Amino acid sequence: MKESINILAIESSCDETSAAVVVNGREVLSNIIASQISTHEKFGGVVPEVASRKHIEVISAVVQEALDEANFTLDDIDAIGVTYGPGLVGALLVGLQYAKGLAFATGKPLIGVNHIEGHISANFIEYKDLKPPFMCLVVSGGHTFIVYMKDYGEFEVLGETRDDAAGEAFDKVARAIGLGYPGGPKIDKISKEGNEEAIKFPRANFHNDTLDFSFSGIKSAVLNYLNKKEMKGEEINKADVAASFQKSVVDVLVDNTIKACMSKKVDKIAVAGGVASNSCLRETLVRECKKKGIEVLIPPFILCTDNAAMIGSAAYFEYIKGRSTSLDINAVPNLKLGER
């Protein structure tokens, strides 16, 4: 096998169009991201049809910019990695069809990547010496998982949400208290001005035999609190509501992830996904894990949000195992982690 394996990666599962060139799964030569946040902000959330159209408008330019920044041509690329699920089906299809076209035209192998696996693999970019096994908390707008990474590309899901994802709950609560979209960063910011002990919102605790999450109850409790305040004509302290809600979500995420670590006897927790940028989650996880002698690994913001570099990393580890994907592959919007 060549000393350097160059992956061109494409990500378009939601509202970011991204392309990257990644070498040997850990070195990023380029990572171009065209965000649609300003487009969807006025709608209060991502509009799938609008997202798909925006991907179509920019994907060619984004891929070319990724190659140019890396000073590569397609001849220098060994394989093309692309997200094929989970995500918005129309958005996924834009990136997938573009990648399939490149693979067909160049004869390069196509490697379909699970978006969640990509988030986990972002840690290999930031932490060059990281090797399995380790625990990973994946928290984003659409997904919440506790994953035990046994080996490269081998996962065991120990806990997942039974309803709303953590990031989804953040967005809905932010909308309810008038903060707008995207909710996660706005709740994080205003919470710094609030008292996290001001309001006691519930924590979803299941039986001891599961590490699953439920955030719909917390979300409903916040909405009920707001409705009661409004009906009584009482003033609502948005900062206190945001801080108290945030703490209730973070406490459950941290507690379950530490329990998972203890059950598998691992001493490393990697964090992935957009909600990993939340300052309360970072601080609480580091503080509580320190008490247990567990190391916490958190990538920088650019690798927490949706990006193609993480897809390139995951694709590399598939490539060296000799795995590639048929050009008949289709988008799988509800793809499960570990499915092929």
Curated annotation (Swiss-Prot):
Protein origin, superkingdom: Bacteria
Residues where substrate binds: 138-142, 171, 184, 188, 278
Subcellular location: Cytoplasm
A Gene Ontology cellular-component term: cytoplasm
SUPFAM superfamilies: Actin-like ATPase domain
Keyword tRNA processing part of the UniProt annotation: yes
EC number of the protein: 2.3.1.234
Essential cofactor(s): Fe(2+)
Amino-acid positions noted as binding Fe cation in the UniProt annotation, renumbered to this chain: 115, 119, 306
Cofactor: binding comment: Binds 1 Fe(2+) ion per subunit.
Pfam families per the UniProt record, alphabetical: TsaD
Enzyme class, UniProt record, top EC level: transferase
Alphabetical UniProt keywords: Acyltransferase, Cytoplasm, Iron, Metal-binding, Transferase, tRNA processing
Principal subcellular localisation of the protein: cytoplasm
BP-aspect Gene Ontology terms: tRNA threonylcarbamoyladenosine modification
GO molecular function terms attached to this record: iron ion binding; N(6)-L-threonylcarbamoyladenine synthase activity
Catalyzed reactions: L-threonylcarbamoyladenylate + adenosine(37) in tRNA = N(6)-L-threonylcarbamoyladenosine(37) in tRNA + AMP + H(+)
Annotated function: Required for the formation of a threonylcarbamoyl group on adenosine at position 37 (t(6)A37) in tRNAs that read codons beginning with adenine. Is involved in the transfer of the threonylcarbamoyl moiety of threonylcarbamoyl-AMP (TC-AMP) to the N6 group of A37, together with TsaE and TsaB. TsaD likely plays a direct catalytic role in this reaction.
Protein family membership: Belongs to the KAE1 / TsaD family.
Record's protein name: tRNA N6-adenosine threonylcarbamoyltransferase
Taxonomic lineage from the root: Bacteria, Bacillati, Bacillota, Clostridia, Eubacteriales
Originating gene: tsaD
